[in-house]
């Protein structure tokens, strides 16, 4: 009954307009003061232990910084050019190229909103110019942008790994096949819609342009090889990989592509050595660091408040109570996965993915292990639910970002995204009930997961 009061407080604060992160933290602290035997000092200890014990959380600010440099530079334009060269000659090819570009940029950014902004700000106008409706273009980008948290490296996967103590490397591998499958399913749906609506196709650009576009985009796409190759080659940990990614992104944006900083200013005639030193204090670098810092603080503030709620639930033994009640009720794996999907789909409509995972993952993880469900399978399924949550109202983040990029009303974006959400629901069913889609690659390359807790 006390826990019901806690969740009513959280919902009540949200309804009166209190930010979600503050609602989680404030409700938890008030609950501790009024209903729990635990002290507030234990909250501070829990937060310290959570961040000190989860070294992988340090990857989040570095991945955000890498994403910021990649978004600020002209990487997105080069990726879009390459994607159009590959699939643009199909009917509906420009929309399919948008999905492919989102898939490639997702592998660089690890963030859905960043993917929508970087790709959508360029291709939506191009699609409209080539005979696509604004609604069609916005709906495609809104959904394809969600691949930013499914295709590795992914910030949300790092959060899940930290919340459940599973391997970040396994989670990244687990997202490869589902990410490719989701992108292919969206492109097939676009092709079918294009045939029905007789949408335009681009002429084949030729092999020379294809190779030139690939060469131009290769410096940016090499980041994926560095991150994943470095992790699975044993060169560095996921956290170190994130730091390397940030440094590499800074180097590529400033010195190779020269899309920002003093090298982008053609009127700057100072010696090269002077320009190199100017790069580190240039206004573009400062602005990128500032924006990445703002996003990092916002995300970690949400995670910190979610950790307080997680602490309260743990103190009240809620995970153990839920596990015991579900197992004693004879709940099987199929029914359990349905319950988790429904819970996450509802929660994803109101909460940011990282905060929701911090709360829900520790609750359902022990039950999943007891039922013999692979932790990587569970993690990828939860990430897919977060994808759908980002494109469903009332607070789906991708909906707001797409509305801003496409200059459309929120309701029009919701209507535009709805047909493609059906594709994502079909994809969720596949990921939920065909576990090898997410477990085959990590098991093949790294062996079976060993649970130690």
Go through each PLM region and give its residues.
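Alpha-helical transmembrane segments of multi-pass membrane transport proteins
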Residues: 1-453
């Amino acid at each position: 009954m006390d826990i019901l009061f806690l969740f009513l407080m959280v919902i009540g604060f949200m309804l009166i307009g209190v930010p979600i992160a503050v609602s989680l933290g404030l409700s938890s602290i008030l609950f501790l003061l009024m209903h729990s035997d635990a002290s507030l000092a234990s909250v501070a200890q829990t937060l310290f232990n959570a961040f000190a014990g989860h070294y992988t959380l340090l990857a989040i600010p570095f991945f955000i910084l890498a994403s910021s440099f990649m978004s600020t530079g002209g990487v997105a334009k080069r990726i879009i050019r390459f994607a159009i060269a590959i699939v643009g000659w199909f009917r509906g090819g420009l929309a399919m190229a948008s999905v492919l570009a989102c898939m490639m940029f997702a592998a660089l950014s690890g963030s859905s909103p960043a993917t929508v902004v970087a790709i959508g700000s360029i291709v939506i106008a191009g699609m409209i110019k080539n005979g696509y409706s604004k609604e069609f273009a916005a709906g495609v980008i809104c959904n394809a942008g969600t691949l930013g948290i499914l295709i590795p490296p992914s910030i949300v996967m790092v959060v899940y790994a930290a919340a459940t103590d599973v391997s970040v490397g396994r989670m990244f591998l687990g997202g490869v096949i589902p990410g490719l499958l989701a992108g292919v399913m969206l492109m097939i749906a676009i092709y079918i819609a294009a045939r029905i609506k007789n949408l335009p196709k681009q002429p084949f650009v030729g092999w020379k342009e294809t190779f030139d576009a690939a060469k131009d985009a290769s410096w940016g796409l090499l980041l994926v090889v560095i991150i994943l190759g470095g992790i699975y080659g044993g060169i560095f940990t996921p956290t170190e990989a994130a730091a390397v990614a940030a440094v590499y992104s800074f180097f590529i944006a400033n010195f190779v592509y020269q899309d920002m900083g003093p090298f982008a200013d053609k009127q700057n005639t100072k010696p090269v050595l002077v320009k190199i030193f100017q790069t580190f204090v240039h206004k573009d670098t400062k602005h990128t660091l500032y924006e990445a810092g703002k996003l990092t603080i916002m995300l970690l503030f949400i995670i910190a408040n979610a950790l307080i709620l997680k602490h309260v639930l743990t103190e009240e033994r809620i995970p153990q109570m839920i596990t015991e009640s579900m197992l004693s009720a004879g709940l099987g794996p199929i029914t359990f996965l349905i319950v988790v999907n429904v819970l996450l789909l509802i929660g994803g409509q109101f909460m940011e993915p990282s905060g929701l995972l911090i709360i829900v993952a520790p609750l359902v993880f022990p039950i999943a292990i007891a039922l013999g469900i692979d932790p990587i399978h569970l993690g990828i399924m939860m990430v897919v639910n977060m994808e759908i949550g980002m494109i469903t109202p009332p607070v789906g983040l991708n909906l707001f970002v797409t509305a801003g990029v496409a200059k459309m009303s929120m309701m029009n974006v919701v209507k535009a995204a709805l047909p493609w959400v059906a594709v994502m629901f079909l994809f969720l069913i596949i990921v939920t009930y065909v576990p090898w889609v997410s477990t085959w690659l990590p098991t093949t390359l790294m062996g079976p997961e060993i649970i130690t807790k």
